[in-house]
Every structure is written in C-alpha cells, then in structure tokens.
UniProtKB/Swiss-Prot annotation:
GO terms for biological process: mitochondrial respiratory chain complex III assembly. The gene is MZM1. It comes from Komagataella phaffii (strain GS115 / ATCC 20864). This is Mitochondrial zinc maintenance protein 1, mitochondrial. Keywords: Chaperone, Mitochondrion, Transit peptide. Residues 1-17 form a transit peptide. Interacts with RIP1.
Length: 122
C-alpha cells in the first residue's frame, strides 16, 4: 500500500473514531477533527522531533485506537448521576490488576487514594 493511501486510510479512521468518541458533542467533535486535520496538513512534525511520515501515521493509528477504546462520553441525567455512552468498541477491564495492587497501597501506616483518607493509621 502506498504511503499516500495509508495516510488517507489513517485520516479517515481517525475521523470515524472522533464520531464514535464525541457523538452528540458538536464542539468537542469539531475541535478534535480540526486538530487531526491541522496535523495532517502540516509538513512538519508539530513537536519538532523530526518523526518520519511512517512514525506519524503509526501515532495517528494509536490515537485512533485510544479514541475508540478509551474515551467514553458521559451525560448528566440527575444530580450525581451520569449516563455513559458505552459502545461496542469500549474497552471494559475486569479490574484484576487494580485489585491486586490495592493491597500494596498502604505505606508506612499511611493509606493512599483508594485505601482511605490519607490519615496515619495505627
């Protein structure tokens, strides 16, 4: 596949991913698409790292995967309640890694974020 056709495919996939991730949020959808469009039109690497075109396309593919799998929209329905737009591509973890690490959160009598208030325990 030529580099131009790979770039077009990556660009289209990124735009589709924004449609899924930011459905019904016109402002965020437009901002995300403008950002992608700006970077695609740019001849230079925006961070100045001199990445090759292949590396930039790989990065765009990774952004696309991240948008599809890790971004979930939430809409407030009641005070303190939100409805999440979980779709078929949303990555749903089982939290096994988090459960395993929870035992190691206490450190020297202090408990951190998920383990409590952060106050010293005796």
């Amino acid at each position: 596949m030529s580099q131009a056709s790979r770039a077009l495919k990556a660009y289209r996939n990124a735009l589709r991913a924004t449609s899924v991730a930011f459905k019904n949020d016109v402002a965020t959808l437009d901002a995300a698409r403008n950002e992608i469009r700006t970077h695609m039109k740019s001849q230079e690497d925006p961070k100045g790292t001199n990445r090759s075109i292949d590396e930039r396309l790989k990065l765009l593919d990774e952004v696309t995967v991240f948008l599809r799998h890790n971004i979930v929209q939430g809409r407030k329905v009641d005070e303190g309640k939100y409805r999440l737009n979980i779709h078929k591509d949303t990555e749903l973890g089982d939290n096994d890694d988090i459960k395993k690490k929870k035992d190691g959160l206490s450190n020297g009598g202090f408990t951190g974020c998920c383990g409590g208030s952060g106050a010293k325990t005796t």
